[in-house]
């Protein structure tokens, strides 16, 4: 399937995830208490940051996942929900979170796309059968507004994802390297001044 692009509707999903938050504070009576269902309906009407990584227990991936975790409150302040997805199962996600110091208190769900249906529908399932390192910003109307895919060896810039979200939410024309609080471009003034 082709890579989703700007204006496409983000696919529906109903997947299992490791709950967000400090795993040591989960009131777990049984192993299943660490897991939850995550569906596309859960965040209807909200901005979503949905990012994919290739594999758990690797080297670049935890740096990115932890970076999204550190900025989660900033995304929440912008009424945006973060979801991280890979094709690993929920038990692998759980073990990785439990063992990796930077992931133990991850505030958002780690989603398992074991059947690879969402990964394929987004167009980021690669020839190795795992997800490409991809990021989607999806608006409250479920429309893709930003797509980024990097090589497996190159981690993404989470600050840039936040910057782009700010620009998209400004609903204005934003120049190169624009940051929240910077002036936006007034095309009307520019056109009037050119005549």
From Swiss-Prot:
CDD domains noted in UniProt: PRX_Typ2cys
Top-rank EC class of the record's enzyme: oxidoreductase
Main subcellular location: cytoplasm
Biological-process GO terms, alphabetical: cell redox homeostasis; cellular response to stress; hydrogen peroxide catabolic process; response to oxidative stress
Pfam families: AhpC-TSA
Domain Thioredoxin, first and last residues per copy: 4-170
EC number: 1.11.1.28
Keyword vocabulary terms for this entry: Antioxidant, Cytoplasm, Disulfide bond, Isopeptide bond, Oxidoreductase, Peroxidase, Redox-active center, Stress response, Ubl conjugation
KW Cytoplasm (keyword) present: yes
Subunit structure of this chain's protein: Homodimer; disulfide-linked, upon oxidation. 6 homodimers assemble to form a ring-like dodecamer. Identified in a complex with AhpD, DlaT and Lpd.
Miscellaneous comment as given in the Swiss-Prot or TrEMBL entry: The active site is a conserved redox-active cysteine residue, the peroxidatic cysteine (C(P)), which makes the nucleophilic attack on the peroxide substrate. The peroxide oxidizes the C(P)-SH to cysteine sulfenic acid (C(P)-SOH), which then reacts with another cysteine residue, the resolving cysteine (C(R)), to form a disulfide bridge. The disulfide is subsequently reduced by an appropriate electron donor to complete the catalytic cycle. In this typical 2-Cys peroxiredoxin, C(R) is provided by the other dimeric subunit to form an intersubunit disulfide.
Family statement drawn from the similarity comment of this UniProt entry: Belongs to the peroxiredoxin family. AhpC/Prx1 subfamily.
PANTHER family documented for this protein: ALKYL HYDROPEROXIDE REDUCTASE C, THIOREDOXIN PEROXIDASE
Role, per record: Thiol-specific peroxidase that catalyzes the reduction of hydrogen peroxide and organic hydroperoxides to water and alcohols, respectively. Plays a role in cell protection against oxidative stress by detoxifying peroxides. Together with AhpD, DlaT and Lpd, constitutes an NADH-dependent peroxidase active against hydrogen and alkyl peroxides as well as serving as a peroxynitrite reductase, thus protecting the bacterium against reactive nitrogen intermediates and oxidative stress generated by the host immune system. Does not however seem to play a role in detoxification of isoniazid.
Name the record gives this protein: Alkyl hydroperoxide reductase C
Source organism (scientific name): Mycolicibacterium smegmatis (strain ATCC 700084 / mc(2)155) (Mycobacterium smegmatis)
């Amino acid at each position: 399937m082709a890579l989703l692009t700007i204006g496409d509707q983000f696919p529906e999903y109903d997947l299992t995830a490791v709950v967000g938050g400090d795993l040591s504070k989960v009131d777990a009576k049984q192993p299943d208490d660490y897991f939850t269902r995550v569906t596309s309906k859960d965040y209807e009407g909200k901005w979503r940051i949905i990012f994919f990584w290739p594999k758990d227990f690797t080297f670049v991936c935890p740096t990115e996942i932890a970076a999204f975790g550190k900025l989660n409150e900033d995304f929440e302040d912008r009424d945006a929900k973060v979801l991280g997805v890979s094709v690993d199962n929920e038990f692998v996600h759980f073990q990785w979170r439990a063992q990796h110091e930077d992931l133990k208190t991850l505030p958002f769900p780690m989603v398992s796309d074991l059947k690879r249906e969402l990964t394929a529908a987004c167009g980021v399932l690669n020839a190795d059968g795992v997800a490409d390192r991809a990021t989607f910003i999806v608006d409250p109307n479920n429309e893709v507004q930003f797509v980024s895919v990097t090589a497996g060896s190159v981690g993404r810039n989470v600050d840039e994802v936040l910057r782009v979200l700010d620009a998209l939410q400004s609903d204005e024309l934003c120049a190169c390297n624009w940051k929240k609080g910077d002036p936006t471009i007034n095309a009307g003034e520019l056109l009037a001044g050119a005549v």
